[in-house]
Amino acid sequence: MKKVAHYILLNKNTPALSFACTRNEFGEPEFVEDSWLVNYRPIGYMNLTSFLEQRKAPKHRRHIKELLERYGCDDLEGFLKVTHALSLNDTFWVKPASSSLTWNDVSLYRNEFDQLISEAAFDGTISASDLSSISPEFGTDGYYAKCWMREGPDIYLYKSGSALHEIEPLSEFLAAQIAAIICPHSVSYDLDFHHGKLISKCKLFTSEHVG
């Protein structure tokens, strides 16, 4: 008889979907919807497995494969257990059905990020210390190394470029100048240095209210 683990997808503190996870004969996790508890779906939702997969950082992103493996996130159920499928794109998250965790306990918007995870995501230096899993790094897409950092009350995305020329941050900065002429409400990018590397950085433009 297959062991069944039960989970809940929530929007902040509102349960949205109950679902189950079993393991097939190859030990791979398989997810099945049990019951929708709200009359809406996350934007772009097609099916449960693809929705959850899309919340996981791609392994081709620089330094992220090692970070995912370090935390036991190399399969999708491990990812859910460690990260709760949190993202700075929206307010959906996952917890075991028996868990008493609340949105205030896990929210990336409200809680401090683990600084060591941010540094590992940016430069590949992975500490052997026990780390907190409150971090947006596990769910951030893209190819080049990047990390989320707090500057006072605000959250910024730091993005590096290729190891050889580092022209990508400059290109992004220049593109933002053009965009500002065309659209006054475009996202602003600045240039800076982080650990001696040229970066582009932009302020987070989502929130708990706007995704």
Give the ranges of each region predicted by the language model:
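Phosphate/dinucleotide-binding and metal-coordinating scaffold of catalytic cores
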Residues: 1-211
